[in-house]
Amino acid sequence: MDVNWQTGVEGLYAAGEAAGTFGLSRPGGTALNSTQVGSQRAAEHIVFSSRRALSETAWEALLSAAEDIRKQTETLLDGCGERVLSQRGRFQQAMSRFAGHLRNPRQMEELFQEAETLLEDYFGKTAAHTPDEIPMAWKNRDMLVTLASVLSAILTAAQACGSRGSGLVASPEGKPLRDGRGRELLRVVPMKDDHRAHCLITEGIPPKSRFVPVRSLPRTDDWFETVWAEYNRRREKPEKYENNA
């Protein structure tokens, strides 16, 4: 995510919860401010940087992508794999069961590997029986890419940090959780203080997650006059601000 709330995919912006930048513990006001500022910056960047016509190379890439989609859609309609409705329900249930508030690392790892294996030949292993199911088939693929990225991040955090935030990591060797009568309900890995000053980055397909140190807050001279002057400079010469990170 750069200063314009543009993701690593050029032209794709994310703000608010979708950006995943709020952190584990944050005041509600800062989350709201981040959402509002991010949306504003993204809108400005879209307006100021979209004045150029697409290059010949970009048009060729779009046409090639359209042809790939046509062929992949034909494969879905001819496929004899798992039907899209069954596929979606199966993965949704597994995520809720193993990767919700209670997290099972072994089952999450198995689910991650299953999703990665399916993505390697998604169109050959998925079937859309009617044209109406084609949109869901494409959404399922996006769901699996997202699912694998989320599981990568959760597994990395579980291994390094234990139970943290709203996620309890279950383990037979963990600390017992008891009800009001002292009866043991389950055992969970205690929270570790490691990586409190780090953020978790997930990138790539297949996804890889890693911790990186957070950046210190910059010391800025953010008076109204200076902020307004910078805004006007962005409007006058947007190309200077297109690739700011």
Predicted feature residues:
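Glycine- and aromatic-enriched mobile tails/lids
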Residues: 1-14, 18-245
